[in-house]
Amino acid sequence: MRQALPLVTRQGDRIAIVSGLRTPFARQATAFHGIPAVDLGKMVVGELLARSEIPADAIEQLVFGQVVQMPEAPNIAREIVLGTGMNVHTDAYSVSRACATSFQAVANVAESLMAGTIRAGIAGGADSSSVLPIGVSKALARVLVDVNKARTTRQRLTLFSRLRLRDLLPVPPAVAEYSTGLRMGDTAEQMAKTYGITREQQDALAHRSHQRAAQAWAEGKLAEEVMTTYVPPYKNPFAEDNNIRGASTLADYAKLRPAFDRKHGSVTAANSTPLTDGAAAVILMTESRAKELGLRPLGYLRSYAFTAIDVWQDMLLGPAWSTPLALERAGLTMADLTLFDMHEAFAAQTLANLQLLGSERFAREVFGRAQATGEVDDAKFNVLGGSIAYGHPFAATGARMITQTLHELRRRGGGFGLVTACAAGGLGAAMVLEAE
């Protein structure tokens, strides 16, 4: 094992995560229908600051992400600053790393803290699958540009006459990889076939996720980290995730047909995470700044790692690649972890990554190591359920996982937790957290 890379400031301060919060997560076109991501971001950051009782001017930087970009608000981070009563001079910029976006936001704020340019910042993300940037065809877009330059009505009519009916149809955001044309579900099907993951195994994992998430809500474990929201027409509060199927049975999962490979596939809507709306954020600061403000941190950021692999085959293996690097940089092994939380984009993807983490062959061929990263103990894995149950607002999931894991570590008396996610483009992210 290489030498650990401690995440500390020049003064030796650890990177403290003092609080975290999220909105409830809503299935597409339900509770947050019509609410853009920027408004969801304002909701969560405004409430996070109000609950923390941290002076607004103590926050020196806000890094926020949004995967499904809205042209009218390209820098969501700055709009959140301007829309929440934060100091107008607060530095703010936006990031995007697909499903690992808020992992990236957290890393960026941590790096600013370690560089000494700030002492406190907010990181997070928001996405809406209900408010989408519906575009126009390339043919229509080109004609519209040319029409603006045309000088006569005749020239304009000539340009429009070149269009076909199909050119006038709206164009929704792409759901496939730009470089390959593959959808995420296509990749999940690849992984199921490559690693011999059955439909029954996928359905069992999905059922486990929903059961554990339902239990977490029933036991009140999520109440402190999920805010109550009010949206137009402001008649009813929305306080709990609405995708969780606590009453489902395994037989219910078996009824669904494959969603991607309809003839030979095993990936269904039930063993995949749904399109979701929501936002999440965390406050980070140096350990000494937290003490100055009289705050007890939820925990500390021990290490992080980002990786990238090829996109043509089994590209959602990011956790299997990033987890060993994050553990190495933290100076830990799999056995040292109290909790292990993996983003469940698809049950097939999750099970494939778990399989490779326990594979000596994978460790030897990819990392040149004699031993596997380690089997993930089921008693430590996604103990409160995962994204299949909660949903997945792309840019918000990382912040949800970090906050959820730190709260659970605190309930268990402290220890180390690892959170990890795959992301489009063959990307992966992992972070090691510590709670006392």
Curated annotation (Swiss-Prot):
Its EC number is 2.3.1.16. The keyword Transferase applies. The active site is at residues 99, 392, 422. Keywords: Acyltransferase, Cytoplasm, Fatty acid metabolism, Lipid degradation, Lipid metabolism, Transferase. Its main location: cytoplasm. It is an enzyme of class 2 (transferase). It catalyses: an acyl-CoA + acetyl-CoA = a 3-oxoacyl-CoA + CoA. The keyword Protein transport does not apply. Pfam families: Thiolase_C, Thiolase_N. Pathway: Lipid metabolism; fatty acid beta-oxidation. GO terms for molecular function: acetyl-CoA C-acyltransferase activity. Gene3D superfamilies: 3.40.47.10. Catalyzes the final step of fatty acid oxidation in which acetyl-CoA is released and the CoA ester of a fatty acid two carbons shorter is formed. Heterotetramer of two alpha chains (FadJ) and two beta chains (FadI). NCBIfam families: AcCoA-C-Actrans (TIGR01930), FadI (TIGR02446), PRK08963.1 (NF006516). This is 3-ketoacyl-CoA thiolase. It comes from Salmonella typhi. The lineage of its organism: Bacteria, Pseudomonadati, Pseudomonadota, Gammaproteobacteria, Enterobacterales.
